[in-house]
Amino acid sequence: MQNVINTVKGKALEVAEYLTPVLKESKFKETGVITPEEFVAAGDHLVHHCPTWQWATGEELKVKAYLPSGKQFLVTKNVPCYKRCKQMEYSDELEAIIEEDDGDGGWVDTYHNTGIAGITEAVKEITLESKDSIKLQDCSALCEEEEEEDEGEAADMEEYEESGLLETDEATLDTRKIVEACKAKTDAGGEDAILQTRTYDLYITYDKYYQTPRLWLFGYDEQRQPLTVEHMYEDISQDHVKKTVTIENHPHLPPPPMCSVHPCRHAEVMKKIIETVAEGGGELGVHMYLLIFLKFVQAVIPTIEYDYTRHFTM
């Protein structure tokens, strides 16, 4: 029944987005929403500091006129996912409601006190160095650490080969260390660890209706075969499956459908972060939007190791 409801909502929102005018005036500080121009600026900032993320165009027929043709959405590929959400230690005491006043019961940070980055942890890691400026440590160095760490095995987007959209780019993680790690685990008898290793391609698009970024993800198993919807749901916090996270068509790419983190609460969560920073005497620039965005959506997909921005300083 929930799938039917989500499908109906999805179709209605497609129409609503089509009819919604493009936001021209910045309302970031007041409401947490951003214009397409601000989305591009935040995307440029993310790509500069974390080059595993890259801009992409997608299908020519799906290009949005309100975004630059070469900057339709952001993508990072072959992101490792070593275990399922059910394998994480969990109890009700670790749960925190981020948004209380919505009809769906709030944005739930399931691993609020476990060290997994969520909305509260994101704010805690913000250090206000002055009232007039915000500084960001060189995140690119953190991104480069992936070349030294053992990650998950690589995966290709085989579904897109015939469309001509599959190409090698800088957004693809270096997976040589991933393979070496898997081999080492095999020699040590860790076969289960290999079978559990998955990889994901993640995308960030601009949602014209909600006027916020939107996260999309599509996964592959250790044999580089696309995961089923049920398998992808295993890597998503069960508090968000079929609620915050639904299966929908990517606005810039051909099928298959992907998991998408619904953006209906993004602006309100961002507004709370802006207020928290302001209470500490600082000011959150709109260029930081996607770095913060990647922090609070990790509460939804805590086992996917995409977040290389967790140690930035403000």
Swiss-Prot record:
Classification of source organism: Eukaryota, Metazoa, Chordata, Craniata, Vertebrata
Subunit structure: Homdimer. Interacts with ATG7; this interaction forms an E1-E2 complex that is essential for the transfer of GABARAP thioester from ATG7 to ATG3 and disrupts interaction with the E3 enzyme complex. Interacts with ATG12; this interaction is ATG7-dependent, essential for phosphatidylethanolamine (PE)-conjugated ATG8-like proteins formation and also mediates the autoconjugation of ATG12 on ATG3. Interacts with FNBP1L.
Motif (Increases ATG3 translation efficiency by the ribomome assisted of EIF5A): 101-103
Protein name per Swiss-Prot or TrEMBL: Ubiquitin-like-conjugating enzyme ATG3
Disordered as annotated region, ranges: 143-167
Subcellular location field: Cytoplasm
Entry EC no(s): 2.3.2.-
Gene giving rise to this polypeptide: ATG3
Main location: cytoplasm
GO BP annotation list: autophagosome assembly; autophagy; autophagy of mitochondrion; glycophagy; mitochondrial fragmentation involved in apoptotic process; negative regulation of phagocytosis; nucleophagy; protein transport
Positions of short motif Membrane-curvature-sensing motif: 4-19
